[in-house]
Amino acid sequence: MFEAIYAGAESGGATPPWDYGAPRPQFVEWAEARSLAGGGHAALVVGCGYGADAEFLARLGFRTTGFDFAPTAIAAARRKYPASEVDYHVADVLDLPGEWQGRFDLVVESLTVQSMPPEQHAAATRSIGALVAPGGTLLVLATTRDEESELTGPPWPLTRAEIEQFADGDLILGRVERIEGGAWWRAELSRPGEGPTSSP
């Protein structure tokens, strides 16, 4: 589905509805509120699309990796940012490279899980959580769904219980906000310990 949407956009069709053409404002607001600075820490953007969030992190000084399931999206990101320092990859969130596990001081997940069928949500949250290094942070952005509301999609917005599923293993759920008039979740999780670098 995602490859078809990106390929259609490349052929003159509609821009993917999740693409802002700029870093996602809910992410930028979070970063600015904590004066986020990379300092050479390793960061990863899940489902990076055309790369706006990944490039934002690189400008803040992170050693940034971005991946997307759609090859057309990654090719477009590389064309858009020819001098980029971001390490772009085509990858499946349900089958990520083993060497990525526990490697990243900051992981940003924005709208990827909710774009997947609900029966894949639990596996996707586990896979994403496993990327976080000791001492690292996971930021989750998703649109909201109340437990009693009808489940229709795509996309399939996340309930509070699904946000809590990211706290798998030793990942600790910290602040959870309902922002944008309650339409969005913004959740922050952390993994205890000290990695090769301190947490951003």
Q: Which ranges hold each PLM region?
A:
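A conserved beta-strand element that flanks and buttresses the S-adenosyl-L-methionine
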Residues: 108
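Class I (Rossmann-like) S-adenosyl-L-methionine-dependent methyltransferase catalytic domain
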Residues: 1-100, 116-200
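Short catalytic micro-motifs in class I SAM-dependent methyltransferases
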Residues: 111-115
